[in-house]
Amino acid sequence: DIETGKTKGNFDGGEDYGTLTADYLLQKMKEDASVVAITSATPTVFGFTKDKREQAGRQFVDVGIAEEHAVALASGLATGGAKPVYGVYSTFLQRCYDQLSQDLCVNNSPATILTFCASVYGMNDITHIGFFDIPMVANIPNLVYLAPTCKEEYFAMLDWAVEQKDHPV
């Protein structure tokens, strides 16, 4: 509603990708010690509440407000045989463009980057608009960009991204 600024639909109460992601990754971590979740000071963006971070233990790394370091860490871990998954708000992805292109993609490191809130609705103030991630990364060689349309596609893409060893996703 333009006059009130409130959305007309009710989006509360359903499943959210953050919770789905954390539950998925915790299960993968139980099955495979090489799976590592990485965040840059926003663990709840992909569902890692305090108790879920404790469940993950050493397989969860928060680098603080250091998106560049998170991508460099993911690249290094992937090169060493781990299966890193970095969860980041779309709007913060711009902070690590050099690391995405030079550390991750030039080396073709098979890390997984999960971008959240990539829309006008996701984070809707003037400094946190998150819809420029696709045009920003579209020209980076070796990077595979996937965009699921439903939960089932999301899980299929996650399975493929985490297990494949050929490209950053």
Features from the language model and the residues they span:
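Thiamine diphosphate
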Residues: 1-169
